[in-house]
């Protein structure tokens, strides 16, 4: 055992042991409690950053701790390998996306191995492998057969120069990120999965997720956006279809003074066909994608279409406007405008001098409608037969009236829209459909799956390479045998990440998407990832799990039992980025200090849910602590080995009850720390675990070894310390455990048990406050009376109470606190 801590040698030795023993390969065991720990799998960018180090260390610490508790632990790793960066690299560097991706995976795998994470590598999944996406295609066809998949036209961002669809993040100031061309809003045919069919269950089952952050659940509730309201039908003059609008305030219907539709609403296009000014307005809105969050602050613009609708109760004509604040993707793309009682409608009415009709009278307050809209409930006025009704009653009465006259109905509306899974990109899973002129859309037969993504394609940066690949596109219809074409869209990459966690359980299964192993391992017991995935990946994965459940593939309702959302890693108060020059390279960190130091620092510097501020001095402090643990263990190695030999031979036994006072006190501290650290591990509060380990080490390193019992105490305490640290710093603990003569490998050692008798003590430390301010401390016997405690408190705080009258003495036993109140 070297005197000096050499992290590179230590970590290589530990990793070789784990690799040789296949320490983390796991199989199903019905006799043990299972624990499935999973961190969101990474996109293979080629290099790990400190955010990766923190995220995956968190998962590894949890997995190792649960294993120490005796559970059957699965912790797999894989690669979310499809996506836009690979295509961009192909265009820029003239390298096939597959080759670029494989190189990046190899580089990142090497970095993961250096971190020492306890992964079952035999379950490694790469989503761009046909053996993986074959079953995604198979499942999509099952959903199509159930009527849960359909194709319809939808508006997308279109780059007219590159002839391709752009993701929202590829549109910069209204222009294509690569070509610089003005982006157009274009309607093309897209594939959708009916997530709205599961909206109610996705919403209600959030209540069962007790171990999810409340913030994430609320974000999903808001995204699903369930609301109870009324659908109202307006007949349109010289137009064949009724205009449907949705509102939660039908009590304001009598105050509607105009209607407004989205710029891409069919009625807007109809109006533009006969009105040049309307067409010019629509053209001016092309390429402007408005986020919902921007609606409150954006300039509201519109134009009168010249068309009119009929009010369903009064029969009066209402002008129909096209407005940029109405979004086609929300509701029906049309709204009834009540300027007196909706602030957005009021602002628009003020700008275009449209009438404002008050129909709700505030109760017991005055309101100036020249200044703003009144948006609360009240008493109806100017509403004909509905006058004098309270808003709450009027909502029901007016809805009933509309239903009786076929002019509307009560309905439940969701903000959530069906999931558009089409991408007009190359590097993704091919959608397994064939388009035949005679038969329409025909699924690829199961026996022809997977539809393999061809690699012999040309990347010009213009259009989708798949559309130019004749060998891929031109096929025979499996239904009629005539010439047909293959679907050239690929799946949104969120599809791959919506079910990968279940496939980890069944890696190697060639005859089915999932098998009974998925039912054993799912749901994931602990999932770890960023909160930025709250309403995309996490919602889609919940949806997919319910789809798989209904197909009989899994037997649980939710995919992830517990969710931990870690904070970001910051440096100088900012997120690490190359542009800011504040990036810390994990490779350099590991080369300099070792993986254990990196792991210890990221666990100690902050609670997992909070942002972590990088600190070079903090890293050095973590390294110094490990060096001290190593040096102490080396200093006492021979003694510890001798004690181990005694214990293994059955001769080592100490009656702790008969030990001297100072030993009992130190042992009490050690077991207090053990109890608290175990509690903190259970709550994922690893920063306080590390703090406890440092206190424990200080206690034993300062302890004077004088008797045989003292030696056994140090042996017991170092055994506890190493096991407490092992999930966080596994390499150094592995080597020290072996070199100090402990039985088995530390990864197979049971979690240390708290000796409850050690938690009992003959003495208690008290603090004394005088008028609420800390003034003294003292130690007293556990059986001291109240009178004795108060007398001791007065004695130790003598300088602060002399010449004062003590009005009251308050003892707070559970806090070991005595407060003296003086006059």
Curated annotation (Swiss-Prot):
One of its GO terms (molecular function) is ATP binding. InterPro entries: aa-tRNA-synth_I_CS, aa-tRNA-synth_Ia, Leu-tRNA-ligase, Leu_tRNA-synth_edit, M/V/L/I-tRNA-synth_anticd-bd, Methionyl/Leucyl_tRNA_Synth, Rossmann-like_a/b/a_fold, tRNAsynth_Ia_anticodon-bd. It is an enzyme of class 6 (ligase). It is found in: Cytoplasm. Pfam families: Anticodon_1 (PF08264), tRNA-synt_1 (PF00133), tRNA-synt_1_2 (PF13603), tRNA-synt_1g (PF09334). It comes from the Bacteria. The gene is leuS. The keyword Glycoprotein does not apply. GO terms for cellular component: cytosol. It comes from Legionella pneumophila subsp. pneumophila (strain Philadelphia 1 / ATCC 33152 / DSM 7513). GO terms for biological process: leucyl-tRNA aminoacylation. It catalyses: tRNA(Leu) + L-leucine + ATP = L-leucyl-tRNA(Leu) + AMP + diphosphate. Keywords: Aminoacyl-tRNA synthetase, ATP-binding, Cytoplasm, Ligase, Nucleotide-binding, Protein biosynthesis. Belongs to the class-I aminoacyl-tRNA synthetase family. A motif ('KMSKS' region) lies at residues 575-579. This is Leucine--tRNA ligase. Its EC number is 6.1.1.4. Transmembrane segments: none annotated. ATP binds at residue 578. A motif ('HIGH' region) lies at residues 42-52.
């Amino acid at each position: 055992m070297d005197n000096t801590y050499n992290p590179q040698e230590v970590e290589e030795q530990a990793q070789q042991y784990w690799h040789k023993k296949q320490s983390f390969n796991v199989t199903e065991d019905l006799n043990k409690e299972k624990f499935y720990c999973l961190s969101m799998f990474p996109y293979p960018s080629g290099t790990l950053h400190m955010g990766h180090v923190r995220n995956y260390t968190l998962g590894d610490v949890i997995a190792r701790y649960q294993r120490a508790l005796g559970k059957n632990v699965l912790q797999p790793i894989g690669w979310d390998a499809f996506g836009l960066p690979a295509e961009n690299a192909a265009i820029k560097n003239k390298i096939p996306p597959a080759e670029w991706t494989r190189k990046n995976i190899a580089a990142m795998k090497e970095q993961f191995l250096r971190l020492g994470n306890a992964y079952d590598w035999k379950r490694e999944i790469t989503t761009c492998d046909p053996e993986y996406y074959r079953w995604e295609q198979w499942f999509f066809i099952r959903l199509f057969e159930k009527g849960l998949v359909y194709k319809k036209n939808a508006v997308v961002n279109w780059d007219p120069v590159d002839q391709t669809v752009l993701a929202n993040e590829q549109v910069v100031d209204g222009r294509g990120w690569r070509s610089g061309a003005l982006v157009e809003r274009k309607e093309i045919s897209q594939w959708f999965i009916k997530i709205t069919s599961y909206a109610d269950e996705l919403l209600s089952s959030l209540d069962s997720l007790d171990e999810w952050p409340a913030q994430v659940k609320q974000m999903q509730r808001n995204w699903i956006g369930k609301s109870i309201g009324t659908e109202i039908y307006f007949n349109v003059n010289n137009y064949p279809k009724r205009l449907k609008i949705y509102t939660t305030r039908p009590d304001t219907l009598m105050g509607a003074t105009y209607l407004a539709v989205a710029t891409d609403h069919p009625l807007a296009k109809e109006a533009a066909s006969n009105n040049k000014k309307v067409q010019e307005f629509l053209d001016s809105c092309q390429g402007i994608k408005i986020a919902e969050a921007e609606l409150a602050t954006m300039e509201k613009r519109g134009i009168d279409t010249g068309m009119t609708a009929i009010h369903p109760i009064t029969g009066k004509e209402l002008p129909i406007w096209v407005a940029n604040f109405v979004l086609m993707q929300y509701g029906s793309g049309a709204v009834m405008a009540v300027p007196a009682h909706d602030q957005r409608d009021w602002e628009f009415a003020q700008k275009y001098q449209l009438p404002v009709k008050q129909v709700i009278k505030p109760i017991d307050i005055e309101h100036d409608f020249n200044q703003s809209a009144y948006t609360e409930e009240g008493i109806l006025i100017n509403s004909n037969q509905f006058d004098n009704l309270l808003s709450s009653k009027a909502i029901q009465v007016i809805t009933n009236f509309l239903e009786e006259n076929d002019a509307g109905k009560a309905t439940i509306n969701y903000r959530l829209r069906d999931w558009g899974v089409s991408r007009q990109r190359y590097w993704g899973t091919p959608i397994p459909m064939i388009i035949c002129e005679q038969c329409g859309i025909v699924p690829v037969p199961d026996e022809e799956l997977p539809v393999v993504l061809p690699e012999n394609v040309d990347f010009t940066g213009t259009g989708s390479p798949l559309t130019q690949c004749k060998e891929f596109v031109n096929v025979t219809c499996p239904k009629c045998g005539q010439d047909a074409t293959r679907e050239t869209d690929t799946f949104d990459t969120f599809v791959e990440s919506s079910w990968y966690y279940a496939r980890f359980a069944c890696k190697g299964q060639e005859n089915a998407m999932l098998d009974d192993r998925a039912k054993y391992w799912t749901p994931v017991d602990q999932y770890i990832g960023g909160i930025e995935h709250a309403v995309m990946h996490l919602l889609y994965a919940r949806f997919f799990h319910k789809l798989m459940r209904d197909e009989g593939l899994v037997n649980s309702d939710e995919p992830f039992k517990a969710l931990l959302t870690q904070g970001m890693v910051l440096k100088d108060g900012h997120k690490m980025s190359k542009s800011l020059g504040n990036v810390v390279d994990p490779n350099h960190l590991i080369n300099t200090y070792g993986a254990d130091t990196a792991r210890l620092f990221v666990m100690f510097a902050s609670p997992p849910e909070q942002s972590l501020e990088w600190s070079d001095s903090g890293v050095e402090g973590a390294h110094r602590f490990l060096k001290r643990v190593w040096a102490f263990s080396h200093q006492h190695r021979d003694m510890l080995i001798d004690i181990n030999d005694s214990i293994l031979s059955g001769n080592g036994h100490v009656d702790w009850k008969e030990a001297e006072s100072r030993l009992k006190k130190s042992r009490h501290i050690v077991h207090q720390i053990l109890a608290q650290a175990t509690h903190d591990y259970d709550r994922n509060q690893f920063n306080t675990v590390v703090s406890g380990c440092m206190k424990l080490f200080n206690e034993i390193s300062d302890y004077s070894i004088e008797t045989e019992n003292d030696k056994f105490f140090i042996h017991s305490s170092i055994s506890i310390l190493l096991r407490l640290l092992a999930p966080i710093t596994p390499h150094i603990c592995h080597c020290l455990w072996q070199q100090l003569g402990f039985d088995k490998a530390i990864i197979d050692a049971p979690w240390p048990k708290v000796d409850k008798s050690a938690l009992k003590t003959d003495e208690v430390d008290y603090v004394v406050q005088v008028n609420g301010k800390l003034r003294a401390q003292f130690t007293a016997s556990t059986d001291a009376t109240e009178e004795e405690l108060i007398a001791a408190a007065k004695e130790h705080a003598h300088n602060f109470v002399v010449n004062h009258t003590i009005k009251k003495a308050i003892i707070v036993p559970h806090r070991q606190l005595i407060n003296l109140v003086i006059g």
